[in-house]
Amino acid sequence: DLSIPMVFMTYANVVFSYGAEKFISTCHDIGIDGLILPDLPYEEKDEFLPICEKYDVDLISLIAPTSDKRIGVISKDAKGFIYIVSSLGVTGTRSEITTDLGSVVSVIRQNTDVPCAVGFGISTPEQASKMASLSDGAIVGSAIIKIIEKYGKDSPKHVGEYIKSMKDAL
């Protein structure tokens, strides 16, 4: 029996507008395992954490390349997996990722055994391979959304081909 964890990524104001309890309980009811709120500062996670725990939905921690102390504090509390932000800024494709992510992963590994994966800007098989070699995986989002925008109803075939090329690189 195969189970693929599903994680929902949205902004905190969407959850607030809908109602945090209603939103997170609905996530649980439809089989969502985790919630990523990229605009939620770590210091404000307690707005959502008790509700996530109540409904067994992991509130996924994002860790940016900042100080070792901050990386350590955030990683000690992590649930589900850790989303390592490849570079500062917004999501989207990038031609290259130059951040020293090896040192970020090293600090995470010193503080937790929760898996970590790198995202923000991963769009090529080469980038996915490099990020997966540094961590437990690579997260691809914006590149898939662009394929869907381009092909609309015909996107499943193209998304499948793209994902296969990424998977083959790992």
Regions found by a protein language model. Name each.
Residues 72-110, 147-149:
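Glycine/Thr-rich beta-alpha phosphate-binding loop at enzyme active sites
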Residues 6-10, 35-37, 59-63, 82-84, ...:
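Hydrophobic faces of well-ordered beta-strands that scaffold small-molecule active sites
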Residues 27, 74, 131, 141, ...:
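Conserved, mostly hydrophobic/aromatic
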Residues 1-37:
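Active-site beta->alpha loop and helix N-cap motifs at the rims of alpha/beta catalytic domains
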